[in-house]
């Protein structure tokens, strides 16, 4: 089966003549197939150079004709220009073209007009898409390989928006980021707009968290829309990263920046569930205070357990307070905290990988709550900018209890701060102030 590709400048009369000859061959020969590529005149030179370079060809004029050994996309064998194609058609098929010059010029004009119209329609189509733009930093992290497919889950974002993914990373190579982009395209998801890879190797010290997120904040301030929403997740300095973004994007509402505590909250629920011999999903309303990746405090004052096999049983929906079901106070004060601090590291040491699945699940839980209608009774923990709630110093990004209503979060005011909790909150605040001062010192020294 003969498979040919015909490419040329859209306004080239010889491309028009070759196109007509190819149509005649395809119409009369059952095994002859042609694929046409009309290229805008302004783009032709660059397109031709790139095509020839990638295939090892030498050709300098329009049109360009080659034969593919398998279906379009396979290895190509250069045939040449118009004269070569005409000679090939005469020699192999006994068919030639007798198109006159004035008709060639007329068809060339029509080709150019058609190409311009198609380009205008494509521009209009892209403008009318209005995709939801999602930027992912550290896109080469294993978490992203798990996260990206789930971003297209129905119900995660209100409506079914077209998603435009922007993948950024400074720790790997441009080739690795390009490979991730190719894998994303291979998902073949209709709601995926063309993903973009944004590789940046300008930073000399990629491990400098302060420098890194100081710059990210400036980029958000300069380029992002004012209703942008930013979720910070990770294993180190999460509160500080979120704080730096807020400081360097002053025109963006600080409520649009949050640090993810959910993974830590779920890990606490897992330890409690194992202690009570229930499923993790049977534990709810666990509150995490403080520094998400540092000194934090697990508050169980509102925590509930469902389907607990104890002396008191009830129907579906019946719950009991976790604090009343756990009688081992020594375990809560010692082993519980120790297990929680080691949990993520234990998993990573066994798999030699980051905790990608649980991190992905936590990110999706917050995205779903933040972008949809959630029950105002459900308690989440979230790192947000303090305005002095619960006596926490204003200006610190601090994990505290929140609830989501109509796509917005609000701090829960119905939480009691005991004397013991106050001591823990003060200790967390002191550590966060130290991290903030450290970041400020780093930025000052590098200025």
UniProtKB/Swiss-Prot annotation:
InterPro entries listed in its UniProt record: Lactate/malate_DH_C, Lactate_DH/Glyco_Ohase_4_C, Malate_DH_type2, NAD(P)-bd_dom_sf
EC number: 1.1.1.-
Keywords: NAD, Oxidoreductase, Tricarboxylic acid cycle
Gene Ontology molecular functions: L-malate dehydrogenase (NAD+) activity
Protein family according to the UniProt entry: Belongs to the LDH/MDH superfamily. MDH type 2 family.
Entry protein name: Putative malate dehydrogenase 1B
Keyword NAD: yes
Phylogenetic classification of the source organism: Eukaryota, Metazoa, Chordata, Craniata, Vertebrata
GO biological process terms, semicolon-separated: malate metabolic process; NADH metabolic process; oxaloacetate metabolic process; tricarboxylic acid cycle
Pfam families (alphabetical): Ldh_1_C
TM region(s), chain numbering: none
């Amino acid at each position: 089966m003969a498979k040919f590709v015909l490419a040329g400048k859209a306004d080239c009369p010889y491309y028009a003549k070759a196109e007509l000859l190819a149509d005649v061959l395809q119409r009369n020969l059952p095994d002859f197939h042609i694929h046409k590529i009309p290229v805008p005149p302004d783009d032709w030179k660059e397109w031709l150079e790139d095509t020839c370079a990638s295939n090892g060809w030498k050709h300098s004029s329009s049109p360009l004709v080659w034969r593919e050994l398998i279906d379009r996309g396979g290895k190509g064998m250069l045939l040449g220009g118009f004269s070569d194609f005409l000679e090939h058609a005469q020699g192999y098929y006994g068919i030639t073209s007798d198109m006159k010059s004035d008709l060639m010029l007329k068809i060339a004009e029509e080709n150019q007009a058609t190409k311009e119209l198609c380009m205008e329609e494509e521009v209009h189509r892209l403008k009318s898409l209005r995709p939801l733009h999602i930027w992912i930093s550290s896109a080469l992290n294993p978490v992203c390989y798990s996260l990206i497919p789930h971003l297209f889950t129905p119900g995660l974002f209100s409506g079914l928006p077209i998603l435009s993914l922007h993948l950024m990373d400074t720790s790997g190579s441009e080739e690795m980021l390009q490979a991730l982009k190719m894998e994303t395209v291979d998902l073949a998801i209709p709601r995926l707009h063309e993903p973009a890879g944004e590789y940046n190797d300008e930073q000399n010290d990629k491990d400098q968290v302060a420098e890194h997120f100081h710059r990210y904040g400036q980029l958000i301030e300069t380029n992002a829309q004012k209703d942008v929403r930013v979720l910070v997740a990770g294993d180190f300095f999460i509160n500080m990263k979120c704080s730096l973004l807020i400081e360097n994007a002053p025109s963006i509402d600080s409520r649009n920046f949050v640090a993810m505590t959910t993974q830590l909250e779920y890990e606490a629920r897992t330890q409690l569930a194992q202690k009570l011999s229930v499923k993790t999903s049977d534990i709810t309303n666990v509150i995490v205070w403080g520094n998400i990746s540092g000194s934090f405090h697990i508050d169980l004052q509102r925590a509930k357990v469902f389907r607990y096999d104890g002396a008191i049983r009830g129907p579906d929906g019946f719950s009991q307070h976790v604090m009343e079901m756990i009688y081992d106070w020594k375990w809560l004060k010692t082993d519980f905290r120790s297990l929680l601090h080691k949990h993520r590291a234990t998993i990573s040491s066994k798999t030699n990988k980051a905790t990608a699945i649980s991190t992905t699940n936590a990110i999706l839980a917050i995205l779903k709550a933040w972008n949809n209608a959630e029950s105002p009774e459900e308690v989440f923990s979230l790192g947000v900018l303090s305005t002095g709630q619960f006596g926490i110093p204003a200006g610190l990004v601090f994990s505290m209890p929140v609830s989501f209503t109509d796509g917005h979060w609000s701090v829960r005011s119905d939480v009691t701060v005991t004397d013991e909790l106050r001591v823990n909150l003060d200790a967390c605040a002191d550590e966060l102030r130290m991290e903030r001062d450290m970041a400020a010192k780093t930025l000052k020294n590098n200025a």
